[in-house]
Amino acid sequence: MNGPVDGLCDHSLSEEGAFMFTSESVGEGHPDKICDQISDAVLDAHLKQDPNAKVACETVCKTGMVLLCGEITSMAMIDYQRVVRDTIKHIGYDDSAKGFDFKTCNVLVALEQQSPDIAQCVHLDRNEEDVGAGDQGLMFGYATDETEECMPLTIVLAHKLNTRMADLRRSGVLPWLRPDSKTQVTVQYVQDNGAVIPVRVHTIVISVQHNEDITLEAMREALKEQVIKAVVPAKYLDEDTIYHLQPSGRFVIGGPQGDAGVTGRKIIVDTYGGWGAHGGGAFSGKDYTKVDRSAAYAARWVAKSLVKAGLCRRVLVQVSYAIGVAEPLSISIFTYGTSKKTERDELLEVVNKNFDLRPGVIVRDLDLKKPIYQKTACYGHFGRSEFPWEVPKKLVF
């Protein structure tokens, strides 16, 4: 069932314009994702009591320990111990036999007030629409017509494999599963005048933490039959698809016991799986004044709206900001040759006419003061219809 362990496999692509692309995802119990979820749980806890809270919360985890650190200015009174432990419990680390236990882990808190230097230049004595960017930076939004979600198939499938394993674990169907998991999907594509069309799944990799009582053969069989076949459309699988299921052979030690975790280390998993581009700023634990998050959400909103309006089949949108300045410094659009309109003039005019990308307007248009962020912290921030930035705007052009 599993592919060759010596790395030898057929990488030939007979069709002109064909290429392969790979994306990965991680599950809720991956140590970096634990930290993302805790940071966003802290953000949500503040927003529930104080929608104007200024939050920059980082998390570190290792065996038996969680550290919260960062800067928060808020009217809320938060029980950080409870927020952290409830999050770990929800993820599924509820027994020391799993290597991490919400009941017994040590929670350290090193949170300070937001720097007054930042506050005075970003939001103090300003109307909300004129709130400045919380820092300089560049952010990207990407969309492609290859899936209904306007997301790359590679990352869509990688996320769905992890989601499926979590569902089977929580329902008790596969009781040997534990929370830490990683997936990776390679898809063969063909190019079509700048757009990309998925043809087949070339390779699937799944590594998931498990208990001691399950055999390798039984795990591989269950992962193929109950995870992969339930998630990946049959039209993309064929007799040449390669599977690397539990390729290490054993994954009992996982979560923070296996690796240290830190907020913001899965930025490609969080976005487009390597497609498009990334400005480097992470999302989790940050309120809307941090344009790393809010402007990246807005750029995705712009990109998806352009594709859904039929103005292009594939697009990358870049925006940039300076600290304390509300208006973006630049807006750039790249359509890979898939639009009949010019990028610099016509499409940019459409964007400027339909979108106001100041942080104080983004927060209003996308309702970013609501405590919605813990849900975003696993399985990707994009391509999920429950989030406002995934609802295309009806464009006037």
Curated annotation (Swiss-Prot):
Positions of Mg(2+) binding: E24
Pathway the protein takes part in: Amino-acid biosynthesis; S-adenosyl-L-methionine biosynthesis; S-adenosyl-L-methionine from L-methionine: step 1/1
Signal sequence, renumbered to the chain: none
One of the record's GO molecular function terms: amino acid binding
CDD domains: S-AdoMet_synt
Pfam families named in the record: S-AdoMet_synt_C (PF02773), S-AdoMet_synt_M (PF02772), S-AdoMet_synt_N (PF00438)
Expression across tissues: Detected in liver (at protein level). Expressed in liver.
PROSITE patterns found in the cross-reference section: ADOMET_SYNTHASE_1, ADOMET_SYNTHASE_2
EC number annotated for this UniProt entry: 2.5.1.6
Residues reported to bind ATP: H30, D180, S181, K182, S248, G249, R250, F251, D259, R265, K266, A282, K286, K290
Official protein name in the record: S-adenosylmethionine synthase isoform type-1
Organism (species): Rattus norvegicus
Gene: Mat1a
